[in-house]
């Protein structure tokens, strides 16, 4: 079953005759539990695609469908709520809230929704990511790799339809990158979590179940 679909997705900037086609008719789908890597060089359109898939930026035309819901048909409030409940994000720069400790950062999406934290699931995530002894730490007391582990936990805590990871190891050294990528792969398998990862690195992309290549705003492979 498809968790995410993009249908003739286009994102244009500027006006004729100086139009930049950041995305130019992108069509693909991601199945439940699949780990997909979208690979492209700088300027290929891969980050624009992630922003469209995550409902962070509207397309010029076309559709993004997540769990059978068309993002373009939602107003801002509906989209914010839907995104919080159904889409987890892992960014290159972690995006942790500096005044919250590790535990508070992880459970923030659940508490923003007024829901009760699933403690059993939380403990499973924390154990898998090796964060048991870090829950009371503040982000500035963590290494880059540890901060990214917290970001992974936060992305998983709502059991989202899909996790979108944008160059998740871009700020990490090679050893820490390998550890973090291994954890993303493992959490995808362990929790049957659908993941789409954006990267420019072919070696990183090979960890995925499937690779999609994007060039000049179009899928080429």
Task: Say what each PLM segment does.
Residues 220-221:
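Generic C-terminal helix-cap and adjacent flexible tail
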Residues 3-207, 211-214:
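ABC family nucleotide-binding domain
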């Amino acid at each position: 079953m498809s968790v995410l679909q993009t249908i003739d997705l286009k994102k244009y900037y500027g006006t004729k005759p100086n139009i930049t086609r950041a995305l130019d008719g992108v069509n693909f789908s991601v199945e439940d539990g699949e780990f997909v890597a979208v690979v492209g060089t700088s300027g290929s359109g891969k980050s624009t695609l992630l922003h469209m898939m995550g409902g962070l930026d509207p397309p010029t035309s076309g559709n993004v469908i997540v769990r059978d819901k068309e993002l373009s048909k939602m107003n801002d409030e509906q989209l914010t709520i839907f995104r919080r409940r159904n889409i987890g994000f892992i960014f290159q720069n972690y995006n942790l809230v500096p005044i919250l400790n590790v535990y508070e950062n992880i459970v923030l999406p659940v508490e923003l929704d007024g829901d009760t934290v699933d403690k059993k699931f939380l403990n499973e995530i924390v154990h898998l990511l090796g964060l048991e002894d870090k829950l009371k730490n503040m982000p500035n007391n963590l290494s880059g790799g540890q901060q990214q582990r917290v970001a992974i936990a936060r992305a998983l805590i709502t059991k989202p339809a899909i996790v979108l990871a944008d160059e998740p190891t871009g700020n990490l050294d090679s050893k820490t990158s390998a550890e973090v990528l291994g954890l993303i792969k493992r959490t995808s398998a362990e929790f049957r979590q659908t993941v789409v990862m954006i990267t420019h690195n072919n070696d990183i992309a090979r960890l995925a179940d499937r690779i999609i290549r994007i060039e000049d705003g179009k899928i080429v492979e």
